[in-house]
From Swiss-Prot:
Pathway: Quinol/quinone metabolism; 1,4-dihydroxy-2-naphthoate biosynthesis; 1,4-dihydroxy-2-naphthoate from chorismate: step 3/7; Quinol/quinone metabolism; menaquinone biosynthesis. It catalyses: 5-enolpyruvoyl-6-hydroxy-2-succinyl-cyclohex-3-ene-1-carboxylate = (1R,6R)-6-hydroxy-2-succinyl-cyclohexa-2,4-diene-1-carboxylate + pyruvate. Its EC number is 4.2.99.20. Belongs to the AB hydrolase superfamily. MenH family. One of its GO terms (biological process) is menaquinone biosynthetic process. The gene is menH. This is 2-succinyl-6-hydroxy-2,4-cyclohexadiene-1-carboxylate synthase. Catalyzes a proton abstraction reaction that results in 2,5-elimination of pyruvate from 2-succinyl-5-enolpyruvyl-6-hydroxy-3-cyclohexene-1-carboxylate (SEPHCHC) and the formation of 2-succinyl-6-hydroxy-2,4-cyclohexadiene-1-carboxylate (SHCHC). InterPro entries: AB_hydrolase_1, AB_hydrolase_fold, SHCHC_synthase_MenH. One of its GO terms (molecular function) is 2-succinyl-6-hydroxy-2,4-cyclohexadiene-1-carboxylate synthase activity.
Length: 253
């Protein structure tokens, strides 16, 4: 899905959503980017890409490169939220990223440091994937959104989110979760310190887990006020201001 004005010389803002999402998840911030060409990608197993599968981070990075080529996008900024942020970090560190001008990550985990942590996470995600395949999706999502990272969501917001996310196909999301488990992601923190392109790490001010990760690994943090893990949904105006300021005045240390 594309959005905004397209000028031949202007680079694109390419957006990658989180698990259970789609390109439509970026709708709250679109009014603030009417003058900016945007590509809202549906990741494998999600939205219009529900029937598309992927094996691992390397393949989804290649799929992203192919999508950009199909769209004729040669120069772009890459923005990813949560799962999309992890894919964006992998693409910047390990993928074929000619034409990529900068990286923007919102609440994405840079990776687990030890093999033991990664193995434990693979098993953890496999258990969730089994639930998404076997249980009624609304029932599984009730438990999914009780996780600590979603603590800032109130009961009304949680029910709205579950109703929206229940339109997904559980088995397709499960396959994507297993292929891109945090346990299968390389530990990217050190690589991120030495990127040759500008990089910012967006995080809701009340997202304690990811604020802590940003401090632990020295990520270039930009906090978004009055927001938790999903900052672009919680405070789109402040979020868009952070993004636009960075796009206008990127700094590479």
């Amino acid at each position: 899905m594309t959005h905004g004005a397209v000028a031949p010389i202007q680079p694109w803002l390419v957006c990658l959503h989180g698990l259970f999402g789609s390109g439509e998840d970026w709708s709250p911030v679109l009014p603030f980017f009417r003058d900016w060409p945007m590509l809202l990608v549906d990741l494998p197993g999600h939205g219009a890409s529900r029937a598309i599968t992927t094996a691992d981070f390397a393949e989804v990075s290649r799929q992203l490169t192919a999508t950009l080529l199909e769209q004729g996008i040669e120069r772009y900024w890459l923005l990813g939220y949560s799962l999309g942020g992890r894919i964006a970090m992998y693409h910047a560190c390990e993928g074929h990223h000619d034409g990529m001008l900068g990286l923007l990550v919102e609440g994405g985990h840079p990776g687990l440091a030890t093999p033991e942590q990664r193995t434990e996470r693979i098993h953890h995600d496999a258990r969730w994937a089994q639930r998404f395949r076997q249980d009624p999706l609304p029932e599984a999502l009730q438990d999914w959104y009780q996780q600590a990272v979603f603590a800032d969501i109130d009961s009304v917001q949680r029910e709205q989110l579950i109703a929206r996310r229940s339109a997904n196909h559980g088995a397709s999301v499960a396959a994507m979760l297993e292929a891109t488990s945090l346990g299968r992601q390389p530990f990217l923190a050190a690589r991120l310190q030495h990127l040759s392109i500008p990089f910012i790490y967006l995080c809701g001010a009340s997202d304690v887990k990811f604020q802590t990760l940003a401090a632990q690994y020295g990520l270039p943090l930009l906090s978004v006020a009055l927001a938790g893990h999903n900052a672009h949904q919680a405070n789109p105006a402040a979020y868009a201001e952070r993004v636009r300021t960075f796009l206008s005045h990127p700094v590479k240390d």
